[in-house]
Amino acid sequence: VIALLMALAATTTPAKPPVVVHKAPIFIQTNAVDPVGTALVRKLCDALDTSTLYRPVTNPADAQYVVGIVTMDPDDAAVGTGAGRSTVASVTLQLENTKGLNHFIYSWVLVANQDKIDTLAEQLFGAIDREIQDLNAQVAR
């Protein structure tokens, strides 16, 4: 029995240590008061929550990147039933700088109807990821 255990121990490969994936911390800074803009921000936060590359943080000083989002209803001043069906959003991607102003990376201006926010949030998250990956590739050179 001892010989069998020794033979098994000699042929068994040791377990590999788990691979630790660093998830870049992102802070979402938002001013979305219109219902469609609020829903867009919520969908973007959902994408961040389930990301394998990024993680949300609640304190901007803990972030590596800051995504700033301001939304408004373009029909807010309209008379009638047009309000509440779309949003206009200004989005910025910034590199967090705890010693002063953040470093600007990229910006987007978006217009979305209520029925398009799922798609828009996915596309925006993909665009943010592409800009971060591009920045990382440039820094690595």
Feature annotation, model-predicted:
Residues N59-A61, A127:
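A generic structural signal for ordered secondary structure
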Residues I26-I28, V67, A89-L93, L124, ...:
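Hydrophobic beta-strand residues in large extracellular and virion-surface proteins
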Residues V20-H22, A61, R85:
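Solvent-exposed loop and beta-edge segments used for protein-protein assembly and interaction
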Residues K16-V20, E96-R141:
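C-terminal/domain-edge helix-coil "capping" segments
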Residues P17-V19, P56-N59:
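Surface-exposed acidic, glycine-flexible loop patches that form ligand/cofactor-binding
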Residues T50-P56, A63-D115:
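Surface-exposed short loop/turn segments
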Residues L8-S51, Q133-R141:
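A structural "domain/chain start" motif
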